[in-house]
Swiss-Prot record:
Residue span of region Domain I: 1-62
Name the UniProt record assigns to this protein: Holliday junction branch migration complex subunit RuvA
Top-rank taxon: Bacteria
GO biological process: DNA recombination; DNA repair
Location of this chain's protein in the cell: Cytoplasm
Lineage: Bacteria, Bacillati, Bacillota, Bacilli, Bacillales
Region (Domain III): 153-205
Main location: cytoplasm
Cross-referenced InterPro entries: DNA_helicase_Holl-junc_RuvA_I, Hlx-hairpin-Hlx_DNA-bd_motif, NA-bd_OB-fold, RuvA, RuvA_2-like, RuvA_C, RuvA_C_sf
Family membership: Belongs to the RuvA family.
Keyword terms of this UniProt record: Cytoplasm, DNA damage, DNA recombination, DNA repair, DNA-binding
Gene Ontology cellular-component annotations: cytoplasm; Holliday junction helicase complex; Holliday junction resolvase complex
Length: 205
């Protein structure tokens, strides 16, 4: 229905952003809302209009390729929008594609809500069907053009990041496990999220 929305970021929260376009605020759920910063510069968000009997929502992405993988993940039995967003938020979408092609279930079960059965279903449904998804085109959500020290964070930024992790489906025990490491840093909300996701995925085996 919508290819993309252009406008200005009016609100950034743990689960979604609000984009103002001609006086209308669009609530758009994204993998990591904090990659979108409030500014006077107009941005473009590629969208997916999700409609079911009990829900209608807009999901947004920085690239068409990111959106493409999201839609393919939704086609897998056992994966809903929240699970697909958690996979994309990891910043390892290229590795997800590689894991599917190489039938690496151990990597796939690292994500919240993905057990062995769902991982196997992802492989069965998507292996050999991701040729149009180019990993190099994905935004690496762990990388940043700024040094982590360029903007000092605070407890507010850390709290926002932890809320974002919970919104993605990570259990409280998992979130608590990475807090000591995050407390050693002084980062922005976006950087805290990237750091936490890196710790969570690298720590799961």
């Amino acid at each position: 229905m919508f290819e993309y929305v252009t406008g200005y970021v009016e609100y950034v929260g743990p689960e979604y952003v609000v984009i103002d376009h001609n006086g209308i605020g669009y609530q758009i759920f994204t993998p990591n809302p904090y990659v979108f910063q409030r500014s006077k510069q107009e941005i473009r968000v590629y969208t997916y209009h999700y409609v079911r009997e009990d829900i209608m929502a807009l999901y947004g992405f920085k690239t068409r390729e990111e959106r493409l993988l999201f839609t393919k993940l939704l086609g897998v039995s056992g994966i809903g929008p929240k699970g697909a967003l958690a996979i994309l938020a990891s910043g390892q979408t290229g590795q997800v594609v590689q894991a599917i092609e190489h039938e690496d279930e151990k990597f796939l079960v690292k994500f919240p809500g993905v057990g062995k059965k769902t991982a196997r279903q992802m492989i069965l449904d998507l292996k050999g069907k991701l040729a149009d998804v180019v990993p190099d085109a994905f935004v690496d959500l762990f990388s940043d053009t700024e040094s982590f020290d360029t903007k000092k964070g605070s407890s507010v930024e850390l709290d926002e990041a932890l809320e974002a992790l919970r919104a993605l489906g990570y259990a409280e025990r998992e979130v608590s496990r990475v807090v000591p490491e995050l407390l050693k840093e002084s980062l922005t909300t976006d950087q805290y999220i990237k750091k936490a996701l890196s710790l969570l995925l690298n720590g799961k085996r």
